[in-house]
């Protein structure tokens, strides 16, 4: 995840018991190191940490909150402002049909992002069409066509036509005439200079009259995103930005902060290669995950959109420590549909600080299938009270599930770990409620 070191530094700060001012100084040094490593502009880093230091040493915490706890709130607020503030991007189309023109430099992940965007809006209930107007890159049409088939979204393209403007115009007309709600136009990303990119953007825009122009930026370019975002923001009043590949680069923080300082709107961020790994960018929620505070609202939203049997009540039960194997089974089935376990667990307040190493390494998904089989071999009594499972029961369960007794013991160990973690989260939830973080929309 972007800026993983910040979360670890904050964890050390909270667990420390020495001099407060010295601890603040050490955390700020760690924060500066992590931000600069993420290619954030040094001047911006120094301005940010100066504000945090001044507030940390001057402000008195409200009654009932320690200075270290209040410091978490200060860091949260200042980082949220740093990445764009608490304004929510307007992602709903203002009318139908709504035409979106995607532009971006070569290698920014634009075609994949077009499909992710189409999938996102399809899950929101819109009829979406994709237009393949990238006539420069070989197999661009085939790639978008394949992605469209994967997500059940139609794709318009003319593989033998090299006129991108004409294809874009015809594609928009095709979907609009058939009553589609949203039309997403993918274009070529062959330009390495901002001026060339913006010139072609204007040419296509003049012909298809888009309602929104979306600039796709690769997070790997770091603070270089500033100039591109600034010129784009000045060139079109209807523009928004998607920052991609945040999971695959250490420079994601630099790219996000560089765009935010221009005043341009970041609507979405790409957090992985899978088609559903595109999320609305809301700085407070993003920062909450960086700090290990979690993003319960984001988790519930993901559950709602994917329509899994994993409710807000289930999340609350886990966080309250009321756990049994029935709930574990339900969670495992749901989590399989929601993507990598590590990313889901990072959304649970406080849990990202204590994610088991095997989940960090991405190996847990391989074991879920085996764990489900083990749970299916348990009796009703064992499901409700896993604590009664002894050596004899372990052998019986393993035989019924077709696994080794060690596999059953491993699941029971994970269950105990989850119970322990959920109890530890109670204290952190109390802190979050005091600070009014993490659980407010």
From Swiss-Prot:
One of its GO terms (molecular function) is 7S RNA binding. Transmembrane segments: none annotated. It holds the Pfam family SRP54_N. It catalyses: GTP + H2O = GDP + phosphate + H(+). GO terms for biological process: SRP-dependent cotranslational protein targeting to membrane. It is found in: Cytoplasm. Its EC number is 3.6.5.4. Its main location: cytoplasm. It is an enzyme of class 3 (hydrolase). GTP binds at residues 104-111, 186-190, 244-247. It comes from the Archaea. Coiled coil: none annotated. GO terms for cellular component: signal recognition particle. The keyword Cytoplasm applies. Keywords: Cytoplasm, GTP-binding, Hydrolase, Nucleotide-binding, Ribonucleoprotein, RNA-binding, Signal recognition particle. The keyword Nucleotide-binding applies. Composed of three domains: the N-terminal N domain, which is responsible for interactions with the ribosome, the central G domain, which binds GTP, and the C-terminal M domain, which binds the RNA and the signal sequence of the RNC. Involved in targeting and insertion of nascent membrane proteins into the cytoplasmic membrane. Binds to the hydrophobic signal sequence of the ribosome-nascent chain (RNC) as it emerges from the ribosomes. The SRP-RNC complex is then targeted to the cytoplasmic membrane where it interacts with the SRP receptor FtsY. Belongs to the GTP-binding SRP family. SRP54 subfamily. HAMAP family: SRP54. Part of the signal recognition particle protein translocation system, which is composed of SRP and FtsY. Archaeal SRP consists of a 7S RNA molecule of 300 nucleotides and two protein subunits: SRP54 and SRP19. This is Signal recognition particle 54 kDa protein. The gene is srp54.
């Amino acid at each position: 995840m972007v800026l993983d070191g910040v979360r670890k530094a904050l964890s050390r700060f909270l667990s420390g018991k020495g001099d407060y001012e010295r601890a603040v100084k050490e955390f700020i040094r760690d924060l500066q190191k992590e931000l600069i490593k993420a290619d954030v502009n040094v001047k911006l880093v120094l301005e940010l940490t100066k504000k945090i230091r001044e507030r940390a040493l001057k402000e008195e915490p409200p009654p009932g909150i320690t200075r270290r706890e209040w410091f978490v709130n200060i860091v949260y607020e200042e980082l949220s402002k740093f990445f764009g503030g608490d304004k929510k991007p307007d992602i709903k189309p203002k009318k139908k049909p709504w035409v979106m023109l995607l532009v971006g430099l070569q290698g920014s992940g634009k075609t994949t992002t077009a499909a992710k965007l189409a999938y996102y809006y399809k899950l929101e209930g819109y009829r979406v069409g994709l237009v393949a107007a990238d006539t420069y890159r070989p197999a661009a049409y085939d790639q978008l066509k394949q992605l469209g088939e994967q997500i059940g979204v139609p794709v318009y393209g003319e593989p033998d036509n090299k006129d991108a403007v004409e294809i874009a115009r015809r594609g928009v007309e095709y979907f609009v005439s058939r009553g589609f709600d949203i039309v997403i136009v993918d274009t070529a990303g062959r330009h390495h200079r901002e001026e060339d990119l913006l010139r072609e953007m204007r040419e296509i825009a003049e012909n298809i009259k888009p309602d929104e122009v979306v600039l796709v930026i690769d997070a790997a370019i770091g603070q270089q995103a500033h100039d591109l975002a600034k010129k784009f923001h000045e060139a079109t009043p209807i523009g928004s930005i998607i920052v991609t590949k945040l999971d695959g680069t250490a420079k994601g923080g630099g790219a996000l902060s560089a765009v935010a300082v221009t005043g341009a709107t970041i609507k979405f961020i790409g957090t992985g290669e899978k088609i559903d790994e595109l999320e609305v960018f809301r700085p407070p929620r993003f920062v909450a995950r960086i700090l290990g505070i979690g993003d319960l609202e984001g988790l519930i939203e993901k559950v709602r959109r994917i329509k899994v049997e994993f409710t807000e009540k289930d999340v609350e039960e886990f966080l309250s420590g009321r756990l049994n194997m029935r709930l574990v089974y339900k969670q495992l089935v749901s989590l399989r549909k929601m993507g990598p376990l590590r990313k889901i667990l990072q959304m649970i307040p406080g849990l990202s600080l204590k994610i088991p190493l095997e989940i960090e390494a991405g190996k847990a998904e391989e074991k879920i299938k085996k764990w489900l089989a083990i749970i299916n071999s348990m009796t009703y009594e064992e499901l409700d009270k896993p604590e009664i499972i002894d050596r004899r029961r372990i052998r019986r369960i393993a035989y019924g599930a077709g696994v080794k007794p060690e596999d059953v013991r491993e699941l029971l160990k994970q269950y105990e770990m989850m119970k322990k973690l959920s109890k530890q989260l109670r204290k952190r939830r109390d802190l979050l409620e005091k600070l009014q973080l993490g659980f407010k929309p």
